[in-house]
């Protein structure tokens, strides 16, 4: 492993860790950054699975107290069973649609132009959602009804389009469906666990032949980097949403997306030939 490969692993690990749980699309940033630094091919597909798994493990660690409370309360606490049921219900739409359409989406939509367009459109929707009057019906994730969970689950499927953002779609969906800002954000984190683990297991099995012993050092660097920066991002976001809206993320999405589109339109970067 040379210095440049190690540097690429660090950069992409940082990008994954920082963006996975912010409403700005980690997949979109990975596609764009990987293209800029020339990290692609079969190794990149395997590497992405590893760093996404690291990011979700960071959330598992951050919410380990709540997870243990739910696990040990399944047999005796109705709220633990209700929470688990809501999580599974919200998870199912992504399972069904992911199995049916994942390959088609990866083939035709995993490119910087799609990402940039989705960033802009998603940013505009976020601004619209933030400026609507919020009527909070649910202050805590334990108080959610099954209908809230199912609707958020369907909204999460929009994130199959790269650039949309899984966390962004579920958080904004939660706000629109009556969840408080804290409840929507926390449920988005919890929903990420089965969704991302399921996606990682599915992709890992499907592309198992891509994992080579020679790539272990690269994978290790990316894993550790992604885990650390995901922890930082999750803690920072939980503090941020206590006193701020998501408007700053919306404007970032719009500006970043327009910048990518501008570089393509004026011929500065040939994004149209890039592929994730």
Swiss-Prot record:
Its EC number is 3.6.1.27. Bacitracin is thought to be involved in the inhibition of peptidoglycan synthesis by sequestering undecaprenyl diphosphate, thereby reducing the pool of lipid carrier available. Pfam families: BacA (PF02673). This is Undecaprenyl-diphosphatase. InterPro entries: UppP. Catalyzes the dephosphorylation of undecaprenyl diphosphate (UPP). Confers resistance to bacitracin. GO terms for molecular function: undecaprenyl-diphosphatase activity. It comes from Pseudomonas putida (strain GB-1). GO terms for cellular component: plasma membrane. It is a multi-pass membrane protein. HAMAP family: Undec_diphosphatase. Keywords: Antibiotic resistance, Cell inner membrane, Cell membrane, Cell shape, Cell wall biogenesis/degradation, Hydrolase, Membrane, Peptidoglycan synthesis, Transmembrane, Transmembrane helix. It catalyses: di-trans,octa-cis-undecaprenyl diphosphate + H2O = di-trans,octa-cis-undecaprenyl phosphate + phosphate + H(+). NCBIfam families: PRK00281.1-2, PRK00281.1-4, undec_PP_bacA.
